[in-house]
């Protein structure tokens, strides 16, 4: 469908929605027309929520997860095991692990993977912050819960080499196929993957 059929404002909404992951041309058109024609109140609610979140959400100064405070609830909790640090790629991975309810340590969210072709290196992943956390905390084990993709393998190797302290480093394994994304695993598979993790160092 030619975008000239739509007014400039509708076209702007469609093009904005197309920037979202997995949203193509047809999906963005359907969403835009539904919100503007069938449910303008929902459109206003979504817009206000997004604006408020965009202005107030930031990254936790420790784990780099999204939060409204300087320190997120997990990093600030006295009930979490600070001796175990789980390194993950995204907030979606954190959500998956937390919903499974088996891990009681703390996290570091990379918000990506090392990928030179995409211009993503150690600096973009805030590995300098991770290094300071490792230096300053009494950590006994670092769990690399990173998807087994080419970029994930590169990232896991870099981090394991970066950690100079005498700390146990393990990698989740069972049930995670090569190229698989952690966020898509069911809870039982995720639990098995953690329980069957292998030592790297």
UniProtKB/Swiss-Prot annotation:
Annotated Toprim domain ranges read 83-177
Q: Where is the signal peptide?
A: none
Q: Where are the zinc fingers (C4-type)?
A: 60-75
What PROSITE patterns would the database entry show?
RECR, TOPRIM
Pfam families attached to this UniProt entry: RecR_C, RecR_HhH, RecR_ZnF, Toprim_4
Keywords of this entry? DNA damage, DNA recombination, DNA repair, Metal-binding, Zinc, Zinc-finger
Q: Name one GO biological process term.
A: DNA recombination
State if DNA damage is listed as a keyword: yes
> Does the record's keyword annotation contain Zinc-finger?
yes
Q: Which InterPro entries match?
A: DNA_Rcmb_RecR, Rcmb_RecR, Rcmb_RecR_Znf, TOPRIM_dom, TOPRIM_RecR
SMART domains to which the protein is assigned, alphabetical: TOPRIM
The UniProt entry, under Gene3D superfamilies, shows: 3.40.1360.10, 6.10.250.240, RecR Domain 1
Q: Which GO terms describe its molecular function?
A: DNA binding; zinc ion binding
Q: Which family does it belong to?
A: Belongs to the RecR family.
* PANTHER family documented for this protein: RECOMBINATION PROTEIN RECR
The record describes the protein's role as: May play a role in DNA repair. It seems to be involved in an RecBC-independent recombinational process of DNA repair. It may act with RecF and RecO.
Report what the protein is called.
Recombination protein RecR
In its UniProt entry, the species of origin is given as: Francisella philomiragia subsp. philomiragia (strain ATCC 25017 / CCUG 19701 / FSC 153 / O#319-036)
């Amino acid at each position: 469908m030619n975008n000239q059929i739509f007014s400039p404002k509708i076209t702007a909404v469609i093009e904005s929605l197309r920037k979202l992951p997995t949203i193509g041309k047809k999906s963005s058109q359907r969403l835009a027309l539904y919100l503007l024609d069938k449910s303008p109140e929902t459109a206003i609610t979504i817009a206000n929520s997004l604006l408020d979140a965009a202005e107030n959400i930031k990254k936790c100064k420790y784990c780099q997860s999204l939060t409204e405070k300087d320190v997120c609830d997990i990093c600030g909790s006295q009930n979490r095991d600070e001796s175990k640090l789980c390194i993950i790629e995204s907030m979606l991975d954190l959500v998956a692990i937390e919903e499974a309810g088996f891990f009681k340590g703390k996290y570091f969210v990379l918000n990506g993977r090392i990928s030179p072709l995409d211009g993503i290196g150690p600096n973009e992943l805030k590995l300098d912050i991770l290094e300071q956390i490792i230096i300053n905390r009494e950590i006994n084990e670092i769990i690399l819960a990173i998807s087994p993709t080419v970029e994930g393998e590169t990232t896991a190797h870099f981090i394991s080499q970066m950690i100079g302290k005498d700390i146990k480093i393990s990698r989740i394994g069972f049930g995670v196929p090569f190229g698989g994304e952690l966020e898509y695993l069911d809870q039982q598979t995720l639990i098995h993957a953690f329980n069957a993790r292998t030592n790297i160092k």
